[in-house]
Amino acid sequence: MDSLNPREQQEFSKLIEHKQMKDFMRLYSNLVERCFTDCVNDFTSSKLTSKEQTCISRCSEKFLKHSERVGLRFQEQNAAMGQGLGR
């Protein structure tokens, strides 16, 4: 990134921010869809039952922990690949 001029650096930063936002929105959408599908079964009321609320809390926590673990594994893999290239 050092070889880019200030304008190019700014454009590159905007691209990175856009991609990060897009990735976050995809993660959020997947979370909502999955937990809603798995947990919400009763459409006779406009409110969630306590069972549905508990299910959604557990589902979202599990989903986010899984996503975090996957991200960490990718970081570890990238670090290992970087070390292998540095030799």
Swiss-Prot record:
InterPro entries: Mito_inner_translocase_sub, Tim10-like, Tim10-like_dom_sf
Pfam families tied to this protein: zf-Tim10_DDP (PF02953)
GO terms under cellular component: mitochondrial inner membrane
Main location: mitochondrion
Disulphide bonds in the chain: 35-59, 39-55
Subcellular location: Mitochondrion inner membrane
Motif (Twin CX3C motif): 35-59
Sorted UniProt keywords: Chaperone, Disulfide bond, Membrane, Metal-binding, Mitochondrion, Mitochondrion inner membrane, Protein transport, Translocation, Transport, Zinc
Oxidoreductase found in the keyword field: no
One Gene Ontology term of the molecular function aspect: metal ion binding
Superkingdom per UniProt: Eukaryota
GO biological process: one example: protein transport
Signal sequence residues: none
Annotated membrane topology: Peripheral membrane protein
Reported function: Mitochondrial intermembrane chaperone that participates in the import and insertion of multi-pass transmembrane proteins into the mitochondrial inner membrane. Also required for the transfer of beta-barrel precursors from the TOM complex to the sorting and assembly machinery (SAM complex) of the outer membrane. Acts as a chaperone-like protein that protects the hydrophobic precursors from aggregation and guide them through the mitochondrial intermembrane space.
Family indicated by similarity: Belongs to the small Tim family.
PANTHER family named in the record: MITOCHONDRIAL IMPORT INNER MEMBRANE TRANSLOCASE SUBUNIT TIM9B
Subunit structure: Heterohexamer; composed of 3 copies of TIM9 and 3 copies of TIM10, named soluble 70 kDa complex. Associates with the TIM22 complex, whose core is composed of TIM22 and TIM54. Interacts with the transmembrane regions of multi-pass transmembrane proteins in transit.
Written domain comment of the UniProt record: The twin CX3C motif contains 4 conserved Cys residues that form 2 disulfide bonds in the mitochondrial intermembrane space. However, during the transit of TIM9 from cytoplasm into mitochondrion, the Cys residues probably coordinate zinc, thereby preventing folding and allowing its transfer across mitochondrial outer membrane.
Protein name: Mitochondrial import inner membrane translocase subunit Tim9
The organism of origin for this protein: Zygosaccharomyces bailii
Lineage summary: Eukaryota, Fungi, Dikarya, Ascomycota, Saccharomycotina
Gene: TIM9
